[in-house]
Curated annotation (Swiss-Prot):
Residues binding ATP: G170, D171, R172, Q173, T174, G175, K176, T177
Protein name: ATP synthase subunit alpha, chloroplastic
Gene label: atpA
Protein location: Plastid, Chloroplast thylakoid membrane
Annotated family: Belongs to the ATPase alpha/beta chains family.
Gene3D superfamilies: 2.40.30.20, ATP synthase alpha/beta chain, C-terminal domain, P-loop containing nucleotide triphosphate hydrolases
Length: 507
């Protein structure tokens, strides 16, 4: 039989008393009054702050958005099917943040930065707040480096610089996503990290974009943040901020980043849904009063920081969908006023076979030629002028029966210039190829060809330049200038190729 010694027992009790640590935990709790439609009304939570995360009994997380006198309105970050009336809720004392790391490159994640591509967990040791303040005036510098999209129409006439916000706007099915994905493809080898945020889209459309990027090796430097049409409104509203937090992580590590929000109309609709369910007063088009702030605080995070913050940048290409070309609706006008210019895609041009369907007349870049290399400035000025004159003449020519020779020549030149702006999807051009194409058109070398021959000739000329006149590409990439030597090489190549092309066509 085991003997119990009194001194041992007293020692154990003494040790326990010494180790005892009296800890008082004050937890701010509340009770669910009502739940439904992704919204919960909570009684209690007296100390909760606006934007604070709250945790429900069964594990769902929500954000406290409405702080009222007798209850708190919480939006749920999940379906909330297991939340019951009367269950308890506790405030976490935190605001929404996500883990960030290099390991996110090449992955598809949701608005909470959790992987949804079935390739396992993502390891990260750091985290960033989803909503963080944009750089102030002093911590920015003006945009001066070009961000090449690979599309002639944009890089020559509506140039985008690193740190700029350029809106892509147009009706549905006009190629807005195609312009954005082509820009991602063109960043290959440019040391630019791309973030593509899909908001409220069909899962099949997102899968299509991911496959296109994977096939061309672009996923290596891209992160896809996706919240599809069946996601809760809260997550669709948060997705762009998650993308911005990831892009900022790289920007403050002196990397250049490009972020695409596809599209902000859907985010505004998700926010409208949340606001109406929270019984916030509706304004124009039933959007809440702070819908401008929703987009401005997101887009202001794109910047070219001053050299004291490193040499990184964050360029934003937000996409907005219009209804039958109406750019004067609420969300389009808001985003136009926030961004540094817009690329307007026209359904009429798209249906007429002009793709990318960019309406050069009303598209604008407020950064302008500061975001172009000298070589592009040298050749692009003439293109802009001639296309503007052509658009005016074309409208006039519809009513005039007999036109003089000079007008006919100008119309013929304009048609050929419009032809050289056409590009296949996922076929971006290098700067040297763009300069060659524009120079050939604006200097009248295409005037002798039929309109149907223009694209074929340009394809062959590009191939010929690549193989036989490699110095041309070298001069442009090393000096960034369209030198006399480069011009002489180009003229020679055009003449040689034109002779060969015309002989082929005669056969």
């Amino acid at each position: 039989m085991v003997t119990i010694r009194a001194d041992e027992i007293s020692n154990i009790i003494r040790e326990r008393i010494e180790q005892y640590n009296r800890e008082v935990k004050i937890v701010n709790t509340g009770t669910v009054l009502q739940v439904g439609d992704g919204i919960a009304r909570i009684y209690g939570l007296d100390e909760v702050m606006a934007g604070e995360l709250v945790e429900f009994e069964e594990g769902t997380i929500g954000i406290a958005l409405n702080l009222e006198s007798n209850n708190v309105g919480v939006v749920l970050m999940g379906d909330g099917l297991m939340i019951q009336e009367g269950s308890s809720v506790k405030a976490t004392g935190k605001i929404a943040q996500i883990p960030v790391s290099e390991a996110y490159l090449g992955r598809v994640i949701n608005a909470l930065a959790k992987p949804i591509d079935g390739r396992g967990a993502i390891s990260s040791s750091e985290s960033r707040l989803i909503e963080s303040p944009a750089p102030g005036i002093i911590s920015r510098r003006s945009v001066y480096e070009p961000l090449q999209t690979g599309l002639i129409a944009i890089d020559s006439m509506i140039p985008i610089g690193r740190g700029q916000r350029e809106l892509i706007i147009g009706d549905r099915q006009t190629g807005k996503t195609a312009v954005a994905t082509d820009t991602i493809l063109n960043q290959q080898g440019q040391n630019v990290i791309c973030v593509y945020v899909a908001i409220g889209q069909k899962a099949s459309s997102v899968a299509q974009v991911v496959n296109a990027l994977q096939e061309r090796g672009a996923m290596e430097y891209t992160i896809v943040v996706a919240e599809t049409a069946d996601s809760p409104a809260t997550l669709q509203y948060l997705a762009p901020y998650t993308g911005a937090a990831l892009a900022e992580y790289f920007m403050y590590r002196e990397r250049h980043t490009l972020i695409i929000y596809d599209d902000l109309s859907k985010q505004a609709q998700a926010y409208r849904q949340m606001s109406l369910l929270l019984r916030r007063p509706p304004g124009r088009e039933a959007y809440p009063g702070d819908v401008f702030y929703l987009h401005s605080r997101l887009l202001e995070r794109a910047a070219k920081p001053s050299s004291s913050l490193g040499e990184g940048s964050m360029t934003a290409l937000p996409i907005v969908e219009t209804q039958s070309g109406d750019v004067s609706a609420y969300i389009p006008t808001n985003v136009i006023s926030i961004t540094d210019g817009q690329i307007f895609l026209s359904a009429d041009l798209f249906n007429a076979g002009i793709r990318p369907a960019i309406n050069v007349g009303i598209s604008v870049s407020r950064v302008g030629s500061a975001a172009q290399i000298k070589a592009m400035k040298q050749v692009a000025g003439k293109l802009k002028l001639e296309l503007a004159q052509f658009a005016e003449l074309e409208a006039f020519a519809q009513f005039a029966s007999d036109l003089d020779k000079a007008t006919q020549n100008q119309l013929a030149r304009g048609q050929r210039l419009r032809e050289l702006l056409k590009q296949s999807q996922a076929a971006p051009f290098t700067v040297a190829e763009q300069i060659m194409t524009i120079y050939t058109g604006t200097n009248g070398y295409l005037d002798s060809l039929e309109i149907g021959q223009v694209r074929k000739f340009l394809v062959e000329l590009r191939t010929y330049l690549k193989t036989s006149k490699t110095q041309f590409q070298e001069i442009i990439s090393s000096t960034k200038t369209f030198t006399e030597e480069a011009e002489a090489l180009l003229k020679e190549a055009i003449q040689e190729q034109m002779e060969r092309f015309l002989l082929q066509e005669q056969v």
